[in-house]
Amino acid sequence: MPKSCAARQCCNRYSSRRKQLTFHRFPFSRPELLREWVLNIGRADFKPKQHTVICSEHFRPECFSAFGNRKNLKHNAVPTVFAFQNPTEVCPEVGAGGDSSGRNMDTTLEELQPPTPEGPVQQVLPDREAMEATEAAGLPASPLGLKRPLPGQPSDHSYALSDLDTLKKKLFLTLKENKRLRKRLKAQRLLLRRTCGRLRAYREGQPGPRARRPAQGS
């Protein structure tokens, strides 16, 4: 069955076929970052599975890498953009999954009611840089005491390729330099071939030793 976004009150699904809409899995290989994702989702006792996803509408533009055709999250990206109709409302636990079946169970009476005249309340949570600055000042970043994840940890998600841009640029520069050196080598070989041809022609055209003519008497 098609998957849907695990964020509360978000109806985006794989089957929507919307352009510029991508889905991203939870960073299970980085527990601290995973805790931030789950906390920002706003669902009580929510436990994502390996195939649970969240759509790209819940990330700020700076969370994505500008290189490539597909939207790739940066290694420290955190979902912070949510539109909750009631910020104090927390949905009950729907099980350990974030797929479409759990999504149907997560629908509450409040979600089925029409929005208020004022419209949904746009809630933007503090981004990761602000939380890191708070930690540097000696203050707790969140009630759970989140810490900054250690750099260099392996990850199986798209945002783990934080150095993808740098690696591709280095590859392009290397290929360009290789092409230049090949042209230079080709020119050197051509020059060497011409020089050898001239030397061979010179040797073939050089006259051999001749006998001395006898001296004529007076």
From Swiss-Prot:
Record bears the keyword tRNA-binding: no
Pfam families, sorted: THAP (PF05485)
Region (Disordered): 97-120, 133-154
Tissues in which the protein is found: Highest levels in heart, liver and kidney. Lower levels in brain and lung.
Motif HCFC1-binding motif (HBM) positions after renumbering to this chain: 156-159
GO biological process: positive regulation of transcription by RNA polymerase II
UniProt entry keywords in alphabetical sequence: DNA-binding, Metal-binding, Phosphoprotein, Zinc, Zinc-finger
The protein's role, per its UniProt record: Component of a THAP1/THAP3-HCFC1-OGT complex that is required for the regulation of the transcriptional activity of RRM1.
Subunit architecture: Component of a THAP1/THAP3-HCFC1-OGT complex that contains at least, either THAP1 or THAP3, HCFC1 and OGT. Interacts directly with OGT and HCFC1 (via its HBM).
The protein, known as: THAP domain-containing protein 3
Record organism: Mus musculus (Mouse)
